[in-house]
Amino acid sequence: ADVRNPLEEFRETDYEVL
């Protein structure tokens, strides 16, 4: 999922960038 669309597909790997 894209960090700009967290509701698209929640993965801790996406939020790891934040």
Swiss-Prot record:
Catalyzed reaction equations: an L-alpha-amino acid + O2 + H2O = a 2-oxocarboxylate + H2O2 + NH4(+); L-leucine + O2 + H2O = 4-methyl-2-oxopentanoate + H2O2 + NH4(+); L-phenylalanine + O2 + H2O = 3-phenylpyruvate + H2O2 + NH4(+); L-methionine + O2 + H2O = 4-methylsulfanyl-2-oxobutanoate + H2O2 + NH4(+)
Disulfide bridges in this chain: none
Names of the cofactor(s): FAD
Annotated keywords: Antibiotic, Antimicrobial, Apoptosis, Cytolysis, Disulfide bond, FAD, Flavoprotein, Glycoprotein, Hemolysis, Hemorrhagic toxin, Hemostasis impairing toxin, Oxidoreductase, Platelet aggregation activating toxin, Secreted, Toxin
Family, per entry: Belongs to the flavin monoamine oxidase family. FIG1 subfamily.
EC numbers: 1.4.3.2
GO terms for biological process, alphabetical: apoptotic process; defense response to bacterium; killing of cells of another organism
Summary of the function given for this chain in its UniProt record: Catalyzes an oxidative deamination of predominantly hydrophobic and aromatic L-amino acids, thus producing hydrogen peroxide that may contribute to the diverse toxic effects of this enzyme. Is highly active on L-Phe > L-Tyr > L-Met > L-Leu, and is weakly or not active on other amino acids. Exhibits diverse biological activities, such as slight hemorrhage, induction of platelet aggregation, edema in the mouse paw and bactericidal activity against both Gram-positive (S.aureus) and Gram-negative (E.coli) bacteria.
Keyword Flavoprotein: yes
Subunit structure: Homodimer; non-covalently linked.
One of the record's GO molecular function terms: toxin activity
Enzyme class name: oxidoreductase
UniProt PTM: Contains 2 disulfide bonds. N-glycosylated. The enzymatic activity is not affected by deglycosylation.
Name of the featured protein: L-amino-acid oxidase
Subcellular localization(s) per the UniProt record: Secreted
A GO CC term assigned to this protein in UniProt: extracellular region
Residue ranges crossing the lipid bilayer per the database entry: none
Distribution of this protein across tissues and organs: Expressed by the venom gland.
